Amino acid sequence: MSEEQVNIKKKEKWGIAHIYSSYNNTIIHITDITGAETISRWSGGMVVKADRDEPSPYAAMLAARRAAEEALEKGIVGVHIRVRAPGGSKSKTPGPGAQAAIRALARAGLKIGRVEDVTPIPHDGTRPKGGRRGRRV
């Protein structure tokens, strides 16, 4: 490779897209590769008016698109994605907005590196709510 090609490769700036998706909201937070500096942060509640629309895939898509536009303006060309659900004693599965957010980031022109699930898993942590016999429906 010539020296010019090496310089072009070095200048590619990557970030991390932290996607927190619950059944109440979706939060997209893009940071630099170390995770220390925030580049862009959007949530479903920031892009829709009605509270009931916050967790929807549509709100997640809009939030991800705006976050991606902001990141591209600041020189980020690609992101590694870290998906997180509430976890712990709460839901271990990401909400409905997670997949839509990943798709929107890809469509917005960001390169996608690795996608990993960083949901906290308890190693026998706190007692789940609902009492001894669980939630009776």
Swiss-Prot record:
Region spans: Disordered: 116-137
Protein task: Located on the platform of the 30S subunit.
Taxonomic superkingdom: Archaea
Keyword rRNA-binding in annotation: yes
Protein's recorded name: Small ribosomal subunit protein uS11
Keywords linked to the UniProt accession: Ribonucleoprotein, Ribosomal protein, RNA-binding, rRNA-binding
Subunit relationships: Part of the 30S ribosomal subunit.
Transmembrane segments annotated in the record for this chain: none
PANTHER family: 40S RIBOSOMAL PROTEIN S14/30S RIBOSOMAL PROTEIN S11 (PTHR11759)
Annotated Pfam families: Ribosomal_S11 (PF00411)
Cellular component GO terms held in the UniProt record: ribonucleoprotein complex; ribosome
Family: Belongs to the universal ribosomal protein uS11 family.
An example Gene Ontology molecular-function term: structural constituent of ribosome
GO biological process, one term: translation
SUPFAM superfamilies: Translational machinery components
Keyword 4Fe-4S: no
PROSITE patterns: RIBOSOMAL_S11
